[in-house]
């Protein structure tokens, strides 16, 4: 079956001042020819004068064939199909918003395209109809093309009744819900940071323990923090959460508390690795490190009684 195609949004053309995602197809004397990815790959052009605010010394440093770019629409002739675009007029903030909108809209597109394939649709018109009866309904309802459908689909993971008002057959509804759940069900991520905490004063060991406990107190019920000793003075902090941004924030907050507490005792605090989402490979390597250190420490008398500190619910 040939691949089905459809634009992301109900309107067939972008409006002037819209920031859109394009893919560069070719570069000519006049400028760069691009495909508007959100509008079923209709053609547009970035004039050379709209590539950069600075003098152009090398076009290839500004734009390359095959690369995606965020550009702003400066002219649309719907009758002739001409779309003029500018790269130099897009601010960094606008580019970030464009990337976010494109990512979410592409997710909705992927879900509906897969629904169409599962249901053996063979014509682009059938996919277009599916968009009209689902994604574009929510885009229009919330007046947010791209975001409306994504937010509605995401909420449908926990509340499928959101889809009740849509004009769908039983098969369409069933397959749509299955695909929404498969693509948008939140996945837990593990976030890790590596720190060094030390205090060489008379009560140095107690000062370190006190600082780490203060960091652990930043744990929440949904985001428990763990702190493991790698090798003095280095520790690894981890938390597992469904909310990536909040998880990063909680670890940063805990690190700030540890830093403040240990420095009150004239101790030392250094960040060896900023909080980041870690992969299974990272975790496997960390587990090997901890296992190796555990074996080494088992041979040493007088080990500290805790290589791992976990958040506790004690008052």
Swiss-Prot record:
Region (Disordered): 292-315
PTM comment text: Phosphorylation at Ser-49 and Ser-52 stabilizes the eIF-2/GDP/eIF2B complex and prevents GDP/GTP exchange reaction, thus impairing the recycling of eIF-2 between successive rounds of initiation and leading to global inhibition of translation, while concomitantly initiating the preferential translation of integrated stress response (ISR)-specific mRNAs.
Modified residues (Phosphoserine): 49, 52
Any GO CC annotation of this UniProt entry: cytoplasmic stress granule
GO molecular-function terms, A-Z: ribosome binding; RNA binding; translation initiation factor activity
Compartmental location: Cytoplasm, Stress granule; Cytoplasm, Cytosol
Domain S1 motif: 17-88
InterPro entries hit by this protein: NA-bd_OB-fold (IPR012340), S1_domain (IPR003029), S1_IF2_alpha (IPR044126), TIF2_asu_C (IPR024055), TIF2_asu_middle_sf (IPR024054), TIF_2_asu (IPR011488)
Keywords recorded for this protein, A-Z: Cytoplasm, Initiation factor, Phosphoprotein, Protein biosynthesis, RNA-binding, Translation regulation
BP GO terms, sorted: cellular response to amino acid starvation; cellular response to UV; negative regulation of translational initiation in response to stress; PERK-mediated unfolded protein response; response to endoplasmic reticulum stress; translational initiation
CDD domains: S1_IF2_alpha (cd04452)
Compositional bias of kind Acidic residues: 299-308
Pfam families membership: EIF_2_alpha (PF07541), S1 (PF00575)
Top-level taxonomic group: Eukaryota
Activity regulation info: Activity is regulated by phosphorylation at Ser-49 and Ser-52, which stabilizes the eIF2/GDP/eIF2B complex and prevents the eIF2B-mediated exchange of GDP for GTP, thereby preventing the formation of the 43S pre-initiation complex (43S PIC). This results in the global attenuation of 5' cap-dependent protein synthesis and concomitant translation of ISR-specific mRNAs that contain a short upstream open reading frame (uORF) in their 5' UTR.
Self-association state and partner proteins as the record states: Eukaryotic translation initiation factor 2 eIF2 is a heterotrimeric complex composed of an alpha (EIF2S1), a beta (EIF2S2) and a gamma (EIF2S3) chain.
Function: Member of the eIF2 complex that functions in the early steps of protein synthesis by forming a ternary complex with GTP and initiator tRNA. This complex binds to a 40S ribosomal subunit, followed by mRNA binding to form a 43S pre-initiation complex. Junction of the 60S ribosomal subunit to form the 80S initiation complex is preceded by hydrolysis of the GTP bound to eIF2 and release of an eIF2-GDP binary complex. In order for eIF2 to recycle and catalyze another round of initiation, the GDP bound to eIF2 must exchange with GTP by way of a reaction catalyzed by eIF2B.
UniProt family annotation: Belongs to the eIF-2-alpha family.
Protein name listed in UniProt: Eukaryotic translation initiation factor 2 subunit 1
């Amino acid at each position: 079956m040939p691949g089905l195609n459809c634009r992301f949004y109900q309107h067939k053309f972008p409006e002037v001042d819209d920031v859109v995602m394009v893919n560069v197809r070719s570069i000519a004397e006049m400028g760069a020819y691009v495909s508007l990815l959100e509008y079923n790959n209709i053609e547009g052009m970035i004039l050379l004068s709209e590539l950069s605010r600075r003098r152009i010394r090398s076009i290839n440093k500004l734009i390359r064939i095959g690369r995606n770019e965020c550009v702003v629409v400066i002219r649309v002739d719907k009758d002739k199909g001409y779309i003029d675009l500018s790269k130099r007029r897009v601010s960094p903030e606008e580019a970030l918003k464009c990337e976010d909108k494109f990512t979410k809209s592409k997710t909705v597109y992927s879900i509906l395209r897969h629904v169409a394939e599962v249901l053996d649709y063979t014509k682009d018109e059938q996919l277009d109809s599916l968009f009209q009866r689902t994604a574009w309904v929510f885009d229009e309802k919330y007046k947010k093309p791209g975001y409306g459908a994504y937010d509605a689909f995401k909420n449908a993971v926990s509340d499928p009744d959101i889809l009740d008002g849509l004009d769908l057959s039983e098969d369409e509804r069933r397959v749509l819900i299955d695909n929404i759940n498969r693509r948008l069900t939140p996945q837990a991520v593990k976030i890790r940071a590596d720190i060094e905490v030390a205090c060489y004063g008379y009560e140095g060991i107690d000062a370190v323990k006190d600082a780490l406990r203060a960091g652990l107190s930043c744990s929440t019920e949904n985001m428990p923090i763990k702190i493991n000793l790698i090798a003095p003075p280095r520790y690894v902090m981890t938390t597992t959460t469904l909310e990536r941004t909040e998880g990063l924030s909680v670890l940063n907050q805990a690190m700030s508390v540890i830093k403040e507490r240990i420095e009150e005792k004239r101790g030392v605090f250094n960040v060896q690795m900023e909080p980041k989402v870690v992969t299974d490979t990272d975790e496997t390597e960390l587990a090997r490190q901890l296992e190796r250190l555990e074996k080494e420490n088992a041979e040493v008398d007088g080990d500290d009684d805790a290589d791992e500190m976990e958040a506790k619910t004690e008052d």
